[in-house]
Amino acid sequence: MIDKLQAIEDRYVELSQKISDPNIISNVNEWRKYVKEHAAIEDIVLKYREYKKVLEDIEATKELLSSNDEELKEMAEEELSQLEEKKEKLLEEIKILLIPKDPNDEKNVIMEIRAGAGGEEAALFAHDLFRMYSMYAEKKGWKVEIMSSNETDIGGFKEVILNISGKGSYSRLKYESGVHRVQRVPTTEAGGRIHTSTATVAVLPEVEEVDVEINPNDIKVDVFRSGGHGGQSVNTTDSAVRVTHIPTGIVVTCQDERSQIQNRERALKILRAKLYEMALQEQQREIAETRKSQVGTGERSERIRTYNYPQGRVTDHRIGLTLYRLQEVLDGDLDEIIDALILNDQAEKLKNMNLN
């Protein structure tokens, strides 16, 4: 690992010279490329330099252990213990920094929440999840925009698609993809029996047009009138848009905006995210087959979390984490769960890295 760190530091020094070179500065594209690479490895280099300084301090302190002055010797032993502890802590921090970054972590999010098994109760649970993520986003200072929704008559969601934008949104919310299960007594249940319902959450990175190119010949666009609850007409013009991607069969419908142009733009944005995710999943499948190891399968069919109302309990099945503060979680207090998922993800990735 030390050889790898030294190579990174050497590259950092080289890049520092390049981004100060007037000949390179005059070529904006080349200069930006070097600045980006320089910034990407800066944290590793600074932490490695701190680690090397601690090693020097350890060697200097060890020399004091041979002193005849007992008081000085005792102080040196205490300092050495602290330095060894600091060295181990820095090593762990460096290992985390060496984990390859997810290129999508800086992207915004397109989140799809769909009612699963459980009929109207599942739709109400989908609305609860929508509220939970909206409140979490608010706590984080992220912006939430409903791109498309299909509401039920009693306030649930058959489906709702959100655009969540803000620093770190995808890097934290990506762990929410999967099947969420709720266990509770529905308001419509006269006998007081506990029902189990599900909703699925898909978290996609929002992608730019440059990331995914859509051939205009590959899409079919249909326009129709927006419908309210029970199919009632809420718009007298054909403003709703349905976009079909012919090669994959993906269909996206948007009708929340009054303008056909806005609905079309939103539908294409969602389609781009879906196509990007398909390409990403295919790439990850190939990597998994090659390496014969997987860091979580990410399959949507997996039940990832249970929300148990009678017990006031939330359990994340992927990491065996159980919290008895259901209401706080539903009010958007998700950091404890997400932080634990991130740590677990980092630990799994470190296992698969050769840092010797």
UniProtKB/Swiss-Prot annotation:
The modification N5-methylglutamine is found at Q232. SMART domains: PCRF. Keywords: Cytoplasm, Methylation, Protein biosynthesis. InterPro entries: PCRF (IPR005139), Pep_chain_release_fac_I (IPR000352), Pep_chain_release_fac_I_sf (IPR045853), Prokaryotic/Mito_RF (IPR050057), RF-1 (IPR004373). One of its GO terms (cellular component) is cytoplasm. GO terms for molecular function: translation release factor activity, codon specific. It is found in: Cytoplasm. Methylated by PrmC. Methylation increases the termination efficiency of RF1. It holds the Pfam family RF-1. SUPFAM superfamilies: Release factor. Belongs to the prokaryotic/mitochondrial release factor family. Peptide chain release factor 1 directs the termination of translation in response to the peptide chain termination codons UAG and UAA. This is Peptide chain release factor 1. It comes from Thermoanaerobacter sp. (strain X514). The gene is prfA.
